[in-house]
């Protein structure tokens, strides 16, 4: 049975555009980078409001970090957003999910596509580093609406330095232009080949594995493009393929 345990709020980091990070400390069971858990807030009537969130922190780090967006009239996010370091919430003892690097076959290039808060699992994986040796190159792509939505911009650049030339990073911003990002949306930039040409690496079914995390529309459209245009298949334990995905709502 997966029980609820108490987590102490360490810090609520409030970013721009209603984005925030919840940092807690709790004696959870060991988890695998890329997994998610459930956070809960207990109401006065004893009922727990709960939602699933992926870990941003690596498994070896002391505190647990979760990245989310404040939802207007959202039952849980409005509670979490207004907590401070004297408060406590509930967290599941054990974690969930198979969106992890140990589930990905060895290949030449691993592509990590994320929109918005879907960047979280990749940060956990890359900080932990375990199983990254299975790939010659890793490409991390983070797509957002505005530059202020790139909450972990500095952390991503630090990871790029740690991995040296093994990690490629690319930011995509859809609603404003910058001198460091591509403009548009992931599916369209794949269709035009602008993304691959800009990075100078190419998605091929015999060399690449693609991970998709975030907006369900992005996941669906990108997955369909890869299946129809790159001759790729969904990756299943019983039937290996080249596409792994996780929807974020």
Curated annotation (Swiss-Prot):
<feature type="binding site">
    <location>
        <begin position="144"/>
        <end position="145"/>
    </location>
    <ligand>
        <name>NADP(+)</name>
    </ligand>
</feature>
<dbReference type="InterPro" id="IPR017938">
    <property type="entry name" value="Riboflavin_synthase-like_b-brl"/>
</dbReference>
<comment type="similarity">
    <text>Belongs to the ferredoxin--NADP reductase type 1 family.</text>
</comment>
<keyword id="KW-0560">Oxidoreductase</keyword>
<dbReference type="InterPro" id="IPR033892">
    <property type="entry name" value="FNR_bac"/>
</dbReference>
<dbReference type="GO" id="GO:0034599">
    <property type="term" value="P:cellular response to oxidative stress"/>
</dbReference>
<dbReference type="InterPro" id="IPR008333">
    <property type="entry name" value="Cbr1-like_FAD-bd_dom"/>
</dbReference>
<feature type="binding site">
    <location>
        <begin position="75"/>
        <end position="77"/>
    </location>
    <ligand>
        <name>FAD</name>
    </ligand>
</feature>
<dbReference type="InterPro" id="IPR039261">
    <property type="entry name" value="FNR_nucleotide-bd"/>
</dbReference>
<dbReference type="InterPro" id="IPR017927">
    <property type="entry name" value="FAD-bd_FR_type"/>
</dbReference>
<keyword id="KW-0963">Cytoplasm</keyword>
<dbReference type="GO" id="GO:0000166">
    <property type="term" value="F:nucleotide binding"/>
</dbReference>
<dbReference type="Pfam" id="PF00175">
    <property type="entry name" value="NAD_binding_1"/>
</dbReference>
<dbReference type="GO" id="GO:0005737">
    <property type="term" value="C:cytoplasm"/>
</dbReference>
<feature type="binding site">
    <location>
        <position position="117"/>
    </location>
    <ligand>
        <name>FAD</name>
    </ligand>
</feature>
<feature type="binding site">
    <location>
        <begin position="248"/>
        <end position="249"/>
    </location>
    <ligand>
        <name>FAD</name>
    </ligand>
</feature>
<feature type="binding site">
    <location>
        <begin position="215"/>
        <end position="217"/>
    </location>
    <ligand>
        <name>NADP(+)</name>
    </ligand>
</feature>
<protein>
    <recommendedName>
        <fullName>Flavodoxin/ferredoxin--NADP reductase</fullName>
        <ecNumber>1.18.1.2</ecNumber>
        <ecNumber>1.19.1.1</ecNumber>
    </recommendedName>
</protein>
<dbReference type="InterPro" id="IPR051930">
    <property type="entry name" value="FNR_type-1"/>
</dbReference>
<dbReference type="Pfam" id="PF00970">
    <property type="entry name" value="FAD_binding_6"/>
</dbReference>
<comment type="function">
    <text>Transports electrons between flavodoxin or ferredoxin and NADPH.</text>
</comment>
<feature type="binding site">
    <location>
        <begin position="174"/>
        <end position="175"/>
    </location>
    <ligand>
        <name>NADP(+)</name>
    </ligand>
</feature>
<keyword id="KW-0274">FAD</keyword>
<feature type="binding site">
    <location>
        <position position="67"/>
    </location>
    <ligand>
        <name>FAD</name>
    </ligand>
</feature>
<feature type="binding site">
    <location>
        <begin position="51"/>
        <end position="54"/>
    </location>
    <ligand>
        <name>FAD</name>
    </ligand>
</feature>
<dbReference type="InterPro" id="IPR001433">
    <property type="entry name" value="OxRdtase_FAD/NAD-bd"/>
</dbReference>
<feature type="domain" description="FAD-binding FR-type">
    <location>
        <begin position="2"/>
        <end position="102"/>
    </location>
</feature>
<keyword id="KW-0521">NADP</keyword>
<feature type="binding site">
    <location>
        <position position="185"/>
    </location>
    <ligand>
        <name>NADP(+)</name>
    </ligand>
</feature>
<keyword id="KW-0547">Nucleotide-binding</keyword>
<dbReference type="GO" id="GO:0004324">
    <property type="term" value="F:ferredoxin-NADP+ reductase activity"/>
</dbReference>
<dbReference type="GO" id="GO:0042167">
    <property type="term" value="P:heme catabolic process"/>
</dbReference>
<keyword id="KW-0285">Flavoprotein</keyword>
